[in-house]
Regions:
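A common structural junction motif
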Residues: 40-41, 112-122, 173-176
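Short, well-ordered beta-strand elements within core beta-sheets of diverse protein domains
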Residues: 52-61, 93-100, 155-159
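PLP-dependent enzyme catalytic core of the Aspartate aminotransferase-like
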Residues: 62, 128-176
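Conserved small-domain helix->loop->beta segment predominantly found in fold-type I
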Residues: 71-119, 141-145
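Conserved PLP-enzyme active-site core in the AAT-like
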Residues: 1-82, 86-87
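Positively charged, small/polar-rich N-terminal and surface patches that mediate targeting and assembly
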Residues: 42, 75, 116, 122-124, ...
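Well-ordered beta-strand positions enriched in small/hydrophobic/aromatic, beta-favoring residues
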Residues: 20-22, 95, 128
Length: 176
């Protein structure tokens, strides 16, 4: 078994480091990975290492606040008539939701004041992404749809701002 983890997101926590981790519980796989890593030398710079360690110091606090905020935002989204479906497993700060009227997506995104329209996820600030035009824009629409990435889907990365500010921002944008 191999686990790949993006340290760029929550572990770094401030959208300023690019890093990852590879883990395995198999000695033979570890030996192969270690050989490749040793011969190719993909290591973090000292500064990136510092940034990652800095982020780890506040990880528990950031995750607690992000999760708490996300749960409050989910309650709001589930009650909003502008939202037809909320996709949230119950933990963490990542929320996906489908809007009732996808033609309003540009208005929603452009009306947000607290959320930032950006692709990086897992930082201290709250972000909104539109996979159709951002992260998955190069994937044909029918393929995206087969993965559940429909054109009415928006993704939120919930940060550590006050939950009531996030909800008010979404409420305003979704009401337009």
């Amino acid at each position: 078994d191999i686990v790949l983890h993006s340290a760029t997101k929550y572990l770094g926590g401030h959208n300023d480091v690019l890093a990852g981790a590879i883990m395995t519980n198999d000695a033979a796989i570890y030996d192969k990975l270690f050989y490749n890593l040793n011969t190719t030398g993909p290591v973090l710079s000292p500064f990136d290492s510092y940034l990652l360690l800095r982020g780890l110091k506040t990880l528990a606090l950031r995750m607690e606040r992000s999760t708490q905020n996300a749960q409050e935002v989910v309650v709001f989204l589930k009650q909003s008539p502008a939202v037809k479906e909320v996709l949230y497993p119950g933990k963490g700060g990542m929320i996906s939701f489908k809007v009732a009227n996808q033609d309003k997506i540009p208005t929603i995104i452009n009306s947000l004041k607290v959320f930032t329209f950006a692709e990086s996820l897992g930082g201290v600030e709250s972000l909104i992404t539109y996979p159709t035009t951002q992260t998955h824009a190069d994937i044909p629409g029918d393929v995206r749809a087969s993965y559940g990435l429909t054109d009415d889907l928006l993704r939120l990365s919930i940060g550590i701002e006050a939950a009531q500010d996030l909800i008010a921002d979404l409420e305003n944008a979704l009401s337009l």
